[in-house]
């Protein structure tokens, strides 16, 4: 059975994080948690953190000095003329007093956070870049100290810093969502770490979707390809052009009810193995089990029944969906999450 993943206890210097997690941004409407799969208004469907350290891996964990590419998946089915996306968080408060990001009165209208004292605006845009400042280092140092002193902390050498994403339409519509930025002293952790207490935290990488398929059976996502990922035009059949977001031209989407799936590479990066700890330290390891949440601007959806009721949900129930397209053009979204703050997606328009 897949275990629940919990963040470590946070420290006084990270007062921004604990209150924000405690409130859960209850007054905000998270685009990730809404269960209506038909997108008919401005929505934030996902948000991801991407760190490129030059090794070819799309990392999700960051440490001081890393430049993070923050990306939001914003759906705008009604073609609002202008949508402004703002990313904010709150500065750490060493006195453990209430920050604007944890003030329920402020969060009733999250737009008020923009420009407030104590609120750090990371940038404006669906995709922005942000470099982790040196002020975060004391938090990471305390994570190391905590792992050295507590056996049960050796598998969770990270903190989650919630980022607030605010999308404002020129028509007056506003939606918000929360993305956890995972911060870890990753250069000190892993199997090769010199400190034994840090050898059992595995830096998290983002999962990926490499194709949208109509599978030939429910045991694997293989069959007729509707759209495939690409890095260049050479990856696309028939001389197609690789899009700026890395997808080849799509095939026609057939009418009628179709079983479709998102293909997730079965590699150590896309589906990682990580350790879990108990009171006496490391208890074992297990694999991630990525799940895809599906959205569309039209049509109808139906879930796939899990056949593995005794343990982790099977592949089909996690990454497949029954879908009937509308007669008009539509966009299909698939957001994959690994349960460890890693995230990616496909957003494909079909005629």
Language model features: what each stretch is:
Residues 1-26:
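Sec-dependent bacterial lipoprotein signal peptides
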Residues 80-86, 287-295:
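Solvent-exposed loop segments of extracellular immunoglobulin-like
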Residues 53-67, 249-260:
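Short, solvent-exposed loop/linker segments at the N-terminal edge
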Residues 159-165, 170-225, 342-351:
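Short beta-strand elements
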Residues 228-241:
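Disulfide-braced loops of extracellular cysteine-rich modules
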Residues 20-54, 246-248, 343-345:
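Bacterial Sec-dependent N-terminal signal peptides
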Residues 73-79, 169, 264-275, 282-284, ...:
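Extracellular acidic, Ser/Thr/Pro-rich low-complexity tracts
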Residues 70, 89, 141-173, 262, ...:
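Internal, hydrophobic beta-strand segments that form the core of beta-sheet-rich folds
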């Amino acid at each position: 059975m897949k275990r629940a993943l919990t963040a470590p206890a946070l420290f006084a210097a990270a007062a921004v994080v604990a209150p924000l997690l405690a409130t859960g941004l209850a007054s905000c409407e998270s685009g990730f948690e809404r269960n209506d799969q038909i997108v008919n208004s401005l929505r934030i469907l996902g948000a991801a953190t991407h760190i490129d350290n030059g090794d070819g891996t799309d990392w999700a964990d960051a440490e001081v000095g890393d430049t993070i590419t923050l990306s939001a998946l914003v759906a705008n089915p009604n073609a609002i003329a202008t949508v402004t996306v703002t990313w904010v968080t709150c500065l750490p408060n060493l006195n453990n007093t209430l920050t604007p990001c944890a003030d329920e009165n402020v969060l009733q209208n999250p737009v008020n956070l923009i420009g407030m004292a104590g609120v750090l605006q990371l940038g404006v845009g669906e995709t922005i870049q942000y470099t982790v400042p040196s002020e975060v280092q004391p938090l990471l140092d305390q994570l190391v100290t905590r792992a050295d002193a507590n056996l049960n902390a050796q598998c969770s050498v990270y903190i989650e810093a919630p980022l607030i994403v605010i999308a404002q339409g020129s028509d007056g519509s506003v939606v918000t969502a929360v993305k956890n930025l995972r911060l870890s002293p990753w250069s000190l952790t892993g199997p090769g770490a010199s400190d034994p207490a840090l050898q059992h935290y595995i830096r998290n990488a983002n999962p990926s979707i490499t194709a949208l398929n109509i599978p030939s059976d429910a045991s694997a996502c293989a069959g007729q390809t509707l759209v495939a990922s690409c890095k260049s035009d050479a990856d696309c059949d028939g001389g197609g052009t690789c899009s700026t977001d890395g997808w080849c031209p799509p095939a026609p989407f057939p009418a009628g009810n179709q079983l479709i799936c998102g293909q997730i590479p079965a590699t150590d990066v896309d589906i990682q193995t990580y350790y879990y700890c108990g009171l006496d330290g490391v208890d074992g390891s297990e694999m991630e089990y990525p799940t895809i949440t599906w959205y569309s601007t039209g049509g109808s959806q139906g879930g796939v029944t899990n056949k593995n009721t005794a343990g982790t949900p099977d592949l089909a129930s996690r990454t497949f969906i029954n879908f009937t397209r509308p007669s008009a053009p539509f966009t299909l979204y698939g957001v994959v999450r690994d349960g460890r703050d890693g995230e990616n997606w496909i957003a494909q328009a079909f005629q």
